[in-house]
């Protein structure tokens, strides 16, 4: 058989070999096509098409050196053939000879309108940092008649991200999904939509905070649940749900919610709240661990220091407590609201007075309680003011403050009891008796009634009760963070970047930009935006394998510190 085949091959003409080679080429049987073209060229080597077809078959066999030799032969015979130049450009591209590839492909593109050609020119432009040119080629590739080159459109979308044009990138990716719903850009589009929904939720979150302040806790819960329906990863909504559960003394539920916040965003603020809740659940060790974790994540977290100060105060470890009250007073609190700053300073100054025995701290605390009363005519703040006067031995002003508290909340038992103690110490025994009698009419508890009856018996016998008003440090209101809009955006900027999502980070940074006025910070924002543009492009290249650049994370952290934002 081999002998017969050899004889048969010798009898074949040039035309026979070309016909057979063309057949194999059309069928994609490139190795056979190469054999036949070589046989044909042995008989006649002056037809440039044969050399071109040989080069084309070798190209598909990834034998690029031989392919280059063949296409050079074709070009020697027909140097102006644009299709030969096109193939030569492709071969150089595969050989990694990018400059030569660009030269021939660019020349070919003047007459050949081919989606693959334009896409490769786009890829080469990207390699040399000519992104505007690359975008032009990718869009040309996609917009070719009957083109379905979604890959080119995806690359165009990535360049839009590199330019920071989120809207055009979103439109490009959406166009891809209309034609291929399972395309890899689906994750990117979902990310963009989720971030926009989260940003739009700020007004709802702010309304929820207002409701908490106004003690409309059920209304606030509804708001935060609404936000979670829109953005299931709204860590701040779980934080506020934890706060509401803590206010209702449902500490296990509060712990569940704060753990959910932490699972979404490993944030110092949330560990401080977890410490508060664990302490109220009786887990002192767990609370201390949570507070220390909060401090490790952010050494400027006043809530963590305050939680530790209160914990050690109640344990009777006054030196430790005093040191942590110092930490609160030393911490720069720019991000916090005026109300939160005043409350933390107020209780910390009282704490310093009671852990050191220095009355001057009470005097310093007075200006903060006055500020809080000006912000909100609350019975709590009038009560604390009365307590401070009491500790300073000023029973007259303590009496006036407690009376002001009762004008806001006439049936508050703690205030009535403290008022009675002040009246007794002022020598106004009959008024003290009248006050205790009023308490009996309000409270319907056998144990409490017996306690008051014993007090009344002593007073009527003109015997001292030796009662003291308990420290306000044993009745601290639930503390929680109330971020302004800039810090809300900033914390989410950090969250998204820390969670390897530079697109979400970029969108939040764009919103922060509109609230920045200082030139120094504006320059930093512009620098971060530029780096995030590159990170977005890199994210689209890697998707699931993407990891945020540590240097960008550190720069974002520095920006947050300059903005006074607490993580």
From Swiss-Prot:
PROSITE patterns, per database record: TPR, TPR_REGION
TPR repeats by residue range: 14-47, 48-81, 83-115, 116-148, 150-183, 199-234, 236-268, 269-301, 303-335, 344-379, 380-412, 414-446, 505-538
Record keywords: Repeat, TPR repeat
Top-level lineage group: Archaea
Keyword Repeat on entry: yes
Alphabetical list of SMART domains matching this protein: TPR (SM00028)
PANTHER family, per database record: CELL DIVISION CYCLE 16,23,27, CELL DIVISION CYCLE PROTEIN 27 HOMOLOG
Name of this protein: TPR repeat-containing protein MJ1428
């Amino acid at each position: 058989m081999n002998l017969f085949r050899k004889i048969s091959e010798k009898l074949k003409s040039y035309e026979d070999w070309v016909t057979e080679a063309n057949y194999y080429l059309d069928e994609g049987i490139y190795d056979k096509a190469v054999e036949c073209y070589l046989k044909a060229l042995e008989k006649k080597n002056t037809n440039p098409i044969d050399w071109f077809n040989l080069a084309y078959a070798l190209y598909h066999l990834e034998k690029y050196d031989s392919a280059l030799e063949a296409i050079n032969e074709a070009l020697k015979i027909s140097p102006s053939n644009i299709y030969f130049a096109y193939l030569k450009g492709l071969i150089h591209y595969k050989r990694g000879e990018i400059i030569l590839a660009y030269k021939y492909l660019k020349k070919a593109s003047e007459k050949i309108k081919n989606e693959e050609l334009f896409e490769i020119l786009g890829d080469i432009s990207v390699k040399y940092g000519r992104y505007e040119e690359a975008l032009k080629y990718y869009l040309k590739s996609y917009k070719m008649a009957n083109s379905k080159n979604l890959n080119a459109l995806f690359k165009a979308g990535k360049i839009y991200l590199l330019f920071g044009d989120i809207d055009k990138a979103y439109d490009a990716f959406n166009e891809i999904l209309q034609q291929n719903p399972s395309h890899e850009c689906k994750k990117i589009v979902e990310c963009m939509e989720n971030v926009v929904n989260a940003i739009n939720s700020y007004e709802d979150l702010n309304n929820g905070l207002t409701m908490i302040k106004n003690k409309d806790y059920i209304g606030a819960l509804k708001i935060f649940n609404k936000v979670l329906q829109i953005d299931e990863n709204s860590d701040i909504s779980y934080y506020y749900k934890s706060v509401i559960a803590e206010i209702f003394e449902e500490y296990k539920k509060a712990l569940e919610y704060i753990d959910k916040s932490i699972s979404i965003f490993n944030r110092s603020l949330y560990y401080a709240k977890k410490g508060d809740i664990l302490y109220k659940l009786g887990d002192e060790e767990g609370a201390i661990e949570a507070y220390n974790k909060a401090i490790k994540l952010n050494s400027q977290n006043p809530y963590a220091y305050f939680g530790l100060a209160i914990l050690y105060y109640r344990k009777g470890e006054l030196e430790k407590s005093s040191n942590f009250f110092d930490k609160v007073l030393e911490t720069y609190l720019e991000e916090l609201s005026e109300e939160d700053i005043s409350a933390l300073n107020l209780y910390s100054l009282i704490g310093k007075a009671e852990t050191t025995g220095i009355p001057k701290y009470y005097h310093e605390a007075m200006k903060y309680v006055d500020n809080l009363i000006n912000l909100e005519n609350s019975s709590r703040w009038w009560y604390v003011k009365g307590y401070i006067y009491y500790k300073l031995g000023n029973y007259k002003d303590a009496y006036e403050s407690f009376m002001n508290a009762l004008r806001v909340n006439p049936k508050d038992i703690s205030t009535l009891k403290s008022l009675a103690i002040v009246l007794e110490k002022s020598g106004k025994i009959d008024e003290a008796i009248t006050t205790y009698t009023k308490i009996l009419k309000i409270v319907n508890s056998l144990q409490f009634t017996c306690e008051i009856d014993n007090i009344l018996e002593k007073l009527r016998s003109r015997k001292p009760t030796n009662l003291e008003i308990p420290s306000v440090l044993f009745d601290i209101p639930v503390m929680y963070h109330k971020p302004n809009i800039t810090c809300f955006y900033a914390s989410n900027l950090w969250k998204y970047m820390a969670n390897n999502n530079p697109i979400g980070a970029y969108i939040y940074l764009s919103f922060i930009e509109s609230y920045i006025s200082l030139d120094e910070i504006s320059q930093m924002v512009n620098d971060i935006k530029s780096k995030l543009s590159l990170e977005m492009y890199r994210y689209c290249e890697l998707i699931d394998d993407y990891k945020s650049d540590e240097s960008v994370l550190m720069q974002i952290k520095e920006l947050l510190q300059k903005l006074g934002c607490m993580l």
